[in-house]
Amino acid sequence: MAEQPVDLSDEALAQAVSAASRAFDQASTLDELAKAKTEHLGDRSPIALARQALGSLPKTDRADAGKRVNVARTQAQAGYDDRLAALRAERDAEVLVAERIDVTLPSTRQPVGARHPITILAENVADTFVAMGWELAEGPEVETEQFNFDALNFPPDHPARSEQDTFHIAPDGSRQVLRTHTSPVQVRTLLERELPVYVISIGRTFRTDELDATHTPVFHQVEGLAVDKGLTMAHLRGTLDAFARAQFGPQGRTRFRPHFFPFTEPSAEVDIWFPNKKGGPGWVEWGGCGMVNPNVLRACGIDPEVYSGFAFGMGLERTLQFRNGIPDMRDMVEGDVRFSLPFGVGA
């Protein structure tokens, strides 16, 4: 059956545009508008068929008919574009209403925690010594007795080696312990680095202490070691005075009291002037220090006739207690975020 000829008259094209405009205007959703577009602007729409029929016209009529078809398509397309913009605006307005945030509602955000003050103090100590030209050094927390005791001049019968003071690692005879101080880093540094050496080590240490107001079985130490030609106790004193002022302010002062440590000779206890001491200011024990024992230097292959050195060690928990007036060390280890919040450093 032969196809019906397409009507290309002005009236037929006007009817096609009018039908398309009505269909677009009646579409209430974007899906309905898409269907109307297919029907009135698609490949089988009246306007598309009119364009296809241009080829069957005489050449003398094609130009005029083509202009009229293009005008019709432009008008229909304009109707579609206007309705599309209107429906999209309606959709966006509905989304804004549905997803709007009620700023008057109480917040459901979890409160921000705070970094632990020991972490903050450790970074502050590291910054202090790095600013003086020192380097950072680290060592393992599970240490051999060779580095924890032997190389530091502890005699075989020293009480610190016993299970009453030190955590020994199974099996028996492994000669491994949880390090009781950060001093093993001294030996490792002297064996691994070329002289001169100026290093600071900050880390956890372990002892079989009961947890109470002034002791904890896991605590943090800062250990300093300097080995160079011509170092004396005066250099040690100047270094610790600078350290004290950095932590306690201009009022920070130190004094030395003679003491004994296996790995330093001469040795001293370091006291810090504690202006916040209950009952008034006074001297409080801060840590230990001294000149590196020649036996320790020899164990690391260093000639003590050529090089000398000094070392010192302080507990970070003890330093925090003095500096911030914290009466009970247990607050530092119980994990209550309320303890950290007053220090004012967000996570």
From Swiss-Prot:
Keyword Protein biosynthesis attributed? yes
Question: Is the keyword Ligase assigned to this protein?
Answer: yes
Task: Tell me the superkingdom of the source.
Answer: Bacteria
Q: Quote the Pfam families the UniProt record gives.
A: Phe_tRNA-synt_N (PF02912), tRNA-synt_2d (PF01409)
Q: How does it assemble?
A: Tetramer of two alpha and two beta subunits.
Give the record's keywords alphabetically: Aminoacyl-tRNA synthetase, ATP-binding, Cytoplasm, Ligase, Magnesium, Metal-binding, Nucleotide-binding, Protein biosynthesis
Q: Which residues cross the membrane?
A: none
Chain residues that bind Mg(2+): E265
- BP GO terms, sorted: phenylalanyl-tRNA aminoacylation
What is this protein called in UniProt? Phenylalanine--tRNA ligase alpha subunit
Location comes to: Cytoplasm
Family, per the entry?
A: Belongs to the class-II aminoacyl-tRNA synthetase family. Phe-tRNA synthetase alpha subunit type 1 subfamily.
Q: Which InterPro entries match?
A: aa-tRNA-synth_II, aa-tRNA-synth_II/BPL/LPL, Phe-tRNA-synth_IIc_asu, Phe-tRNA_ligase_II_N, Phe_tRNA_ligase_alpha1_bac, Phenylalanyl-tRNA_Synthase, tRNA-bd_arm
Instruction: Give the Gene Ontology MF terms in alphabetical order.
Output: ATP binding; magnesium ion binding; phenylalanine-tRNA ligase activity; tRNA binding
Entry's Gene Ontology cellular component terms? cytoplasm
Question: What is catalysed by this protein?
Answer: tRNA(Phe) + L-phenylalanine + ATP = L-phenylalanyl-tRNA(Phe) + AMP + diphosphate + H(+)
Q: Which Gene3D superfamilies match?
A: Bira Bifunctional Protein, Domain 2 (3.30.930.10)
Q: Which coenzymes or cofactors are required? A: Mg(2+)
Q: How is the cofactor bound?
A: Binds 2 magnesium ions per tetramer.
Tell me what organism the protein belongs to: Mycolicibacterium vanbaalenii (strain DSM 7251 / JCM 13017 / BCRC 16820 / KCTC 9966 / NRRL B-24157 / PYR-1)
**Known HAMAP family for this protein?**
Phe_tRNA_synth_alpha1 (MF_00281)
If you read the UniProt record, what top EC class would you report for this enzyme, in one word? Answer: ligase
Q: What is its EC number?
A: 6.1.1.20
Gene it is expressed from? pheS
